[in-house]
Swiss-Prot record:
Protein name: Uncharacterized protein AF_1584
Membrane topology: Multi-pass membrane protein
Cellular component GO terms, alphabetical: plasma membrane
UniProt KW keywords: Cell membrane, Membrane, Transmembrane, Transmembrane helix
Subcellular location: Cell membrane
Length: 146
C-alpha cells in the first residue's frame, strides 16, 4: 500500500507541476512547494489511516480537510493573509480533481488491484485522462468557448 501510495503521490505532483510550470514558469515555484507539502501531509495521514483499516470515503474526506488546513496555514505563514483566497481557489480546484480521481478510481476498481502492476498503471492513466478531459470541457463551457 505504501509503494502504491507513493507512486500515486508522485503522479499527482507531476500532474500539478507540469501545467503549473508550463503556464507560470519558475514564478509559481512556491505554489508547487505548497502543494508538495500539502500532498506529503495528506499522504502521511492516508498511511496512518490505512494502518488501522483500508481507507474509505470518510478517510479520504479527512485527508482533504487536513490538506486544506495545511494549505491555509502555509499560505498565511509564508505570504500573509492576502494570498489565502487565491490559494483556496487553487486548493478547491485540486480538491475537485482529487474527488473526481477518487470517484473514477472506484469506478475502475483500482482499489482491487493487489500490486502496482502495468495493469494498475494503465488504469490509473485512463482515470487521469478522463478526469482532465472532463475538467477541460467544463472549463471551456465556463469561458464560453463552446
Amino acid at each position: 500500500m505504501v509503494r502504491r501510495g507513493a507512486m500515486v503521490l508522485l503522479t499527482m505532483l507531476i500532474l500539478y507541476a507540469a501545467p503549473s510550470f508550463a503556464l507560470y514558469g519558475l514564478a509559481d515555484f512556491m505554489s508547487f512547494v505548497y502543494v508538495g507539502a500539502i500532498m506529503i501531509v495528506a499522504f502521511g495521514v492516508y498511511i496512518i489511516l490505512g494502518r488501522s483499516k483500508k481507507p474509505g470515503f470518510k478517510e479520504m474526506l479527512a485527508v482533504m480537510l487536513i490538506s486544506a488546513l495545511t494549505a491555509i496555514f502555509l499560505a498565511y505563514f509564508f505570504s500573509g493573509s492576502e494570498v489565502i483566497v487565491p490559494k483556496l481557489k487553487s486548493l478547491g480546484l485540486f480538491a475537485v480533481v482529487a474527488a473526481m480521481l477518487l470517484a473514477l478510481a472506484r469506478v475502475f476498481r483500482l482499489e482491487a488491484e493487489a500490486d502496482f502492476s502495468l495493469r494498475f498503471f494503465l488504469k490509473w492513466i485512463l482515470v487521469v485522462a478522463i478526469t482532465f478531459t472532463i475538467l477541460s470541457v467544463f472549463m471551456l463551457f465556463l469561458r464560453g468557448v463552446v
